[in-house]
UniProtKB/Swiss-Prot annotation:
Gene that this polypeptide is encoded by: sufS
Sequence similarity: Belongs to the class-V pyridoxal-phosphate-dependent aminotransferase family. Csd subfamily.
Keywords: Cytoplasm, Lyase, Pyridoxal phosphate, Transferase
Modified residue annotations for N6-(pyridoxal phosphate)lysine: K226
Cofactors, names only: pyridoxal 5'-phosphate
Highest taxon, organism lineage: Bacteria
Keyword Cytoplasm: yes
GO BP terms, alphabetized: cysteine metabolic process
Protein localization: Cytoplasm
Protein name, as recorded: Cysteine desulfurase
Pathway field: Cofactor biosynthesis; iron-sulfur cluster biosynthesis
PROSITE patterns registered for this protein in UniProt: AA_TRANSFER_CLASS_5
Organism classification: Bacteria, Pseudomonadati, Pseudomonadota, Gammaproteobacteria, Enterobacterales
Length: 406
């Protein structure tokens, strides 16, 4: 079946606008994806006619809002095939989800002399929390090195793991290189050593189906705003037996069972004890609409369309003089590049003049920039609403910039 690209594009109102007098070509979805009408309308309808504080309310609006919120928890659990909706914690995004694990599970399980393994391709959100945990506990942070093609040096893994390895924290897909890591093999190896595995799924869930049970990971986290949903909402999956033993890392309303000035405080059960304060209910409802939207299109169909477009893009960009591409031939979602010796900021500014939105900078992956010995890269994203014509405009724009700047 042909992917309904025109119908999809019609659902995203921003795609009708112009930038610098030209149609917008939005190639920055890996930073944050645009939102379809279905998501915008679902959140707006909630605020117009259904808003109330959730939990403990006896009135109709509160009960209905609570039901809607918890239904999205169930919906999200099915989306990633968790065993139970109660294995999912609503968080502000991937960054908060990783920090939750580092600050709740981490101090209970990581000691001086232990080690945590990450990779050289990680986003800062999957580096800095572990650096902070290691600094507090005296644990060692070990790093899986990169190959020049943007894949990991998997042959180094046996030398990195040992009986003191407590956690492997790894990107499902690199936000810069588009590398999809071989998670089943990596997770199986980690478990052989008794280590837990956290997967940063921020760049994966919008491109193909994710099954946390099949992966056998212990933690999986993703953001709503990259999945065509609202900002300020994400999901942390934690294997049930781990979640039940984790203490809360934030205190406040909603996460308590009892509070006494003389007897102290007891916590409510998971996952709610990790959701202190008033939740982003509107964002949660918008996330549910985003999940419903991509599932209605079909993740297999989205994946096929995007992969075909990615292959086309790589073919077109191969004809751009002095263009350096970073990452493996088989990649998901992103194309990182530099043009000659020109700074990524300059190239991105020229592309913006042509109505083309790309991301420039270090992409919250400074160690990766250090590995490639560059201060920055340009990054074009391939999403389900992008077209062959937009790819052509990118290639043509880069050729034009090369002619202008030499």
């Amino acid at each position: 079946m042909t992917f309904p690209i025109e119908k999809v594009r019609a659902d995203f109102p921003v795609l009708t606008r112009e930038v610098n007098g030209l149609p917008l070509a939005y190639l920055d979805s890996a930073a944050s994806a645009q939102k379809p009408n279905q998501v915008i309308d679902a959140e707006a309808e909630f605020y117009r006619h259904g808003y109330a504080a959730v939990h403990r309310g006896i009135h109709t609006l509160s009960a209905q809002a609570t039901e809607k919120m918890e239904n999205v928890r169930k919906q999200a659990s099915l989306f990633i095939n968790a065993r139970s909706a109660e294995e999912l914690v609503f968080v502000r995004g991937t960054t908060e989800g990783i920090n939750l694990v580092a600050n709740s599970w981490g101090p209970e399980n990581v000691r001086a002399g232990d080690n945590i393994i990450i990779s050289e391709m990680e986003h800062h959100a999957n580096i800095v929390p572990w650096q902070m945990l290691c600094a507090r506990t005296g644990a060692e942070l070990r790093v899986i090195p990169l190959n020049t093609d943007g894949t990991l040096q998997l042959d180094t893994l046996p030398s990195l793991f040992d009986e003191r390895t407590r956690l492997l924290a790894i990107a499902h897909v690199s936000n810069v290189l588009g590398t999809e890591n071989p998670l089943p093999e990596m997770i199986a190896l980690a478990h052989q050593y008794g280590a837990k595995v956290l997967v940063d799924g921020a760049q994966a869930v919008m491109h193909h189906a994710v099954d946390v049970q099949a992966l056998d990971c212990d933690f999986y986290v993703f953001s709503g705003h990259k999945l065509y949903g609202p900002t300020g909402i994400g999901v942390l999956y934690v294997r049930e037996e781990l979640l039940q033993d984790m203490p809360p890392w934030e205190g406040g309303g909603s996460m308590i069972a009892t509070v006494s000035l003389t007897e102290g405080t007891t916590w409510t059960k998971a996952p709610w004890r990790f959701e202190a304060g008033t939740p982003n209910t509107g964002g949660i409802i918008g996330l549910g609409a985003a999940i419903e939207y991509v599932c209605a299109l079909g993740l297999a169909e989205i994946s096929e369309y995007e992969q075909n477009l990615m292959h086309y893009a790589l073919e077109q960009l191969a004809d751009v003089p002095e263009l350096t591409l970073y990452g493996p031939a088989n990649r998901l979602g992103v194309i990182a590049f530099n043009l000659g010796k020109h700074h990524a900021y300059d190239v991105g500014s020229f592309l913006d003049n042509y109505g083309i939105a790309v991301r420039t900078g270090h992409h919250c992956a400074m160690p990766l920039m250090t590995y490639y010995n560059v201060p920055a890269m340009c990054r074009a994203s391939i999403a389900m609403y992008n077209t062959h014509e937009e790819v052509d405009r990118l290639a043509t724009g880069l050729k034009r910039i090369h002619r202008l700047l030499g």
